[in-house]
Amino acid sequence: RVGVETGGSNVQFAVNPANGDVVVIEMNPRVSRSSALASKATGFPIAKIAEKLAVGYTLDEIPNDITKATPASFEPTIDYVVTKIPRWAFEKLPGTSGVLGTQMQSVGEVMAIGRTFPESLQKALRSLEQGRLGLNCDPAEKQLAQISTDELMRLVDIPTPDRIFIIGELLLRGVSVDAVHEACKVDPWFLDQMSIIIEERDAVKSSNPSAMTKAAWKRVKRVGFSDAQLAYLWGSAESEVRAARETAGVIPTYKTVDTCSAEFAALTPYHYSTYEDENEVRESDRQRVIILGSGPNRIGQGIEFDYCCVHASFALRDAGFETVMVNCNPETVSTDYDTSDRLYFEPLTKEDVLNVIAAETAAAGGKKPKVIVSLGGQTPLKLSGQIPVDLIAGTSPASIDLAEDREKWNALCESLNIPQPPGGTAINLEQAMTIVDRVGFPVLVRPSYVLGGRAMQIVHDRDHLTRAMAELSSFGSLGKEGGLSAERPVLVDRFLEDATEVDVDAIRDHTGEVLIGGVMEHVEEAGVHSGDSACAIP
């Protein structure tokens, strides 16, 4: 009736859980956001096949790019679970309610793959890079612990990004699945799966790294618990948890997304981690280079970094290297199965990245890969200090830290007699007040290791400074970004009013030759972030 004779379509429908009645909501006679997600989840390239169908091919004439042995008419079959979670940026938009509704408010999304729903869910939650390590079991859960059960039961009915964590807290307190379902109307199947995570947490909370058996390690990892979550639960260091797990012989294996549940061989390696026995990473003796992607799109870190990662993969492949991409964003080109020689759809966390490095080292017969951290924005930069220095290709972690750490950068400029606004670094309000007494208002307050002006403020008076420092005390999500401490000071310096801002992009090779790629003058006055300012070249 609609008239779509060839090509792709997207149909959305609703199911009544009480009686199974189905109601069609809408149809899109084209590929859509969900088509892209389905393609990444299954390895079946819907858009590519839809366009071939539109010019006259039939499904049985189009080969499956992953297996090369089956036609496109062979429907994808999966033996894993995929979880997609949107990435919201309400922290960038103060004053918004944070309540989800019929209008899209997310700025990005993550996708995770696991053998079970609990494993996939916890991997997706830690992929968001919003300070959560999984379904609670992390320092951020302490905020929920202060709220009464009655109040949580009221809040769980409101669709917000935090609702899943509220559900986890209620289940942890012993509230039944039926009671939570009645309050929030989330399908009981999902609540049952989340309760499996809570039950496993209860089962191991009184243990410790040295007391865990191999079977216990495998059980807790198969429901998605990260080493960082277990370290929090046991009051241990993450490195201690990792060492104990590896000593017990429990390391992740990598399975392949192959569209056919392993019925045919996959020629395009597209992997996800789990804790089983057989590893499917292909062995070879070529030099491998791992490119760490940018994670979910957000305000200040988007597709421009994915562009860099993708072209780096193409260039390295042309130079004879075996390219390995690590990312968790289904909206990107970097997570296409044919962009790199091998793709790991994994969270960009210390544990997951070190696991990929270990797997690649083993598959290369002990030859360690190189790792590029400078192309994916702040996400891989924050991980640079947790990766062995000898593995990092390009800019060293020490140089990255020198440029990103406000205190070190200020000291460098001062030693080189480079002019800069007067100011200083502070780790508390008292120190910040001392600085403004010396330099005067207005001042610019900036944390280290941020992108897109995250948590930066132009401050005009003492009351505003008090509020800004209070907000920074609770700010943070990953690595060195967050909080106020000796390791995470903020820069408080004089704001230059009526100034013109200029960006210079340069690239340097190992011989010392420098090429200036562009000089951009901002149209907006200083104080407007470069991402929000028009600019002109030259």
Predicted regions and their residues:
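ATP-dependent carboxylate activation and anion-phosphoryl transfer catalytic cores
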Residues: 1-224, 247-252, 262, 266, ...
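A generic structural signal for short coil/turn motifs at secondary-structure boundaries
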Residues: 34-37, 299-302, 400
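C-terminal amphipathic alpha-helical interaction region
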Residues: 229-280
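Glycine/threonine-rich flexible loop motifs
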Residues: 298-308, 379-384
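N-terminal Rossmann-like NAD(P) cofactor-binding module of classical short-chain dehydrogenase/reductase
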Residues: 372
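A conserved helix-loop-beta module that forms one wall/lid of the active-site cleft
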Residues: 389-391, 395-456
